[in-house]
Swiss-Prot record:
Pfam families: DBI_PRT. It comes from the Bacteria. Keywords: Cobalamin biosynthesis, Glycosyltransferase, Transferase. This is Nicotinate-nucleotide--dimethylbenzimidazole phosphoribosyltransferase. It comes from Corynebacterium glutamicum (strain ATCC 13032 / DSM 20300 / JCM 1318 / BCRC 11384 / CCUG 27702 / LMG 3730 / NBRC 12168 / NCIMB 10025 / NRRL B-2784 / 534). Pathway: Nucleoside biosynthesis; alpha-ribazole biosynthesis; alpha-ribazole from 5,6-dimethylbenzimidazole: step 1/2.
Length: 358
């Protein structure tokens, strides 16, 4: 399988609409540019939807991809792998941080168990955990193809159900090790540059993590132009499915609000699977994991928030979601200088450009 067999060509957000949105924003009752990044976000959503002003974002969806990682047995995490399944149950029961944030923002949460370490099976399952990427492939060819198809199918389900913005989340002990290996491989960053503390590891565990990532990157050193091979060798079923989910969202012209290092590593892979997918990304926040900044720079993304978060689950992106909604609502609900009878700036038109709702 090659990516072109799975993903259609990605069309970019409407650049003509994007150019017109600045004039639209300048017609609103405020000094030009005074809403800062909120203006940029609103303009981006307009371009994604192909209309000015953009439709309000009333159907956001958080999809958390869960899986265990064989590399977790190498001492790279402060927690045992059993926590992954326990936290998945916590999310299902509504007791995790992402559930609280989602309820506050009026967003639903869906958990996808691709590869947690238990016997259950279903349409969204790929395997029970995965290979330890420092010494063996994460998946077989059959498994990676299944993971990619699952992620693509879930994106189609959510878009077909009316989702207007998607937030992928992650869950799984050891997944920051896998994410750092992917980021290092795609960006050619050294292992020590991309390795963070994950769940709060000590110095000895950090050294083990550096070693595991170094070995994984070495195993993938000749595969940078083959994203499916990289996914098979050094990712995991949950990250591969997440990458396909992100890639297909872009194919379906649906913006993706990115979370932390694991999600952004999957976004790097998604942009390789479906070139141009990054044009549909917004970075919700910058996490404390070093690899996250490396990945954001590679995708040319400037995050909305920087709150020192590193939880995962989609929590940072979900926290940023209200600001994205505000950016859209400002374009819909603010008065223009003309409609409000307010004098605009000197030597400038106060009329908004013609709205395009096609």
């Amino acid at each position: 399988m090659v990516p072109a067999e799975l993903f259609a060509r990605v069309e970019f957000p409407d650049h003509k609409i994007l150019a017109q949105t600045k004039d639209f924003h300048d017609s609103l009752t405020k000094p030009p540019g005074s809403l800062g990044k909120l203006e940029q976000i609103g303009c981006f959503i307009s371009a994604c939807q192909g209309q000015i002003p953009p439709r309000p974002l009333n159907n956001s969806k958080i999809v958390v991809f869960a899986g265990d990682h064989g590399v977790a047995t190498k001492g790279v995490s402060a927690y045992p792998s059993s926590v992954s399944l326990q936290m998945a149950e916590n999310i299902t029961n509504g007791g995790a941080a992402i559930n609280v944030i989602a309820r506050t923002t009026g967003t639903s949460v869906r958990l996808i168990d691709t590869s947690l370490d238990h016997e259950a099976w279903g349409d969204e399952r790929v395997s029970r955990s995965c290979g330890s990427i420092d010494v063996e492939d994460a998946m077989t060819q059959e498994q990676v193809e299944r993971a990619l198809k699952i992620g693509k199918r879930i994106a189609d389900q959510e878009v077909d159900a009316g989702a207007d913005i998607l937030i992928p989340g992650d869950l799984g002990i050891g997944n920051t090790t896998t994410a750092a290996a992917l980021v290092g491989t795609f960006t050619l960053a050294e292992p020590v540059v991309v390795v963070g503390r994950g769940t709060g590891i000590d110095d000895e565990a950090w050294k083990l993590k550096v070693s595991a990532i170094r070995d994984a990157m070495f195993r993938a050193r000749d595969l940078r132009q083959d994203p499916i091979a990289i996914a098979r060798k050094i990712s995991s079923p949950d990250l591969a499915a997440m990458a396909a989910f992100i890639a297909q969202a872009a194919v379906r012209r649906t913006p993706v609000l990115l979370d932390g290092v694991v999600v952004t590593a999957a976004a790097l892979l998604a942009n390789k699977l479906a070139p141009g997918a990054r044009r549909w990304f917004i970075a919700g926040h910058r996490s404390t994991e070093p690899a996250h900044s490396v990945a954001l720079n590679a995708l040319a993304l400037d995050p909305i928030l920087e709150l020192g978060m590193s939880l995962g689950e989609g929590s940072g992106a979900a926290t940023a979601l209200p600001l994205v909604k505000i950016a859209v609502d400002l374009m819909n609900d603010m008065s223009t200088f003309s409609s409000a009878g307010v004098d605009g700036p000197l030597n400038a038109s106060s009329e908004a450009p013609e709205q395009n709702t096609e």
